[in-house]
């Protein structure tokens, strides 16, 4: 009995429908990801007239840097920031800090 339950659990984790993919423009239900940014946190906020933190962070334009690696601390004041995260900017699209959500892009001088 327990082995059948374990097999079913393992099988359900392997199915592609149970995987989450955030790199696409729409969800599996066809909802644009931009709608999720506005609605996800807003449902937990008491004052819905204000913008959610996810909406505020998405309005900040990507920060252009010269090098390939950027060190994100979240704020200029270390007491208000987060642990330092080194982000590699090898891709053409902006890289996102996992703590604060700031986006960084390499500034190509071509």
Curated annotation (Swiss-Prot):
One of its GO terms (cellular component) is mitochondrion. InterPro entries: NDUFS6, Znf_CHCC. Residues 1-22 form a transit peptide. Gene3D superfamilies: q5lls5 like domains. Keywords: Electron transport, Membrane, Mitochondrion, Mitochondrion inner membrane, Respiratory chain, Transit peptide, Transport. It is a peripheral membrane protein. It is found in: Mitochondrion inner membrane. Its main location: mitochondrion. One of its GO terms (biological process) is mitochondrial electron transport, NADH to ubiquinone. Accessory subunit of the mitochondrial membrane respiratory chain NADH dehydrogenase (Complex I), that is believed not to be involved in catalysis. Complex I functions in the transfer of electrons from NADH to the respiratory chain. The immediate electron acceptor for the enzyme is believed to be ubiquinone. Complex I is composed of at least 49 different subunits. This is a component of the iron-sulfur (IP) fragment of the enzyme. Belongs to the complex I NDUFS6 subunit family. This is NADH dehydrogenase [ubiquinone] iron-sulfur protein 6, mitochondrial. It comes from Arabidopsis thaliana.
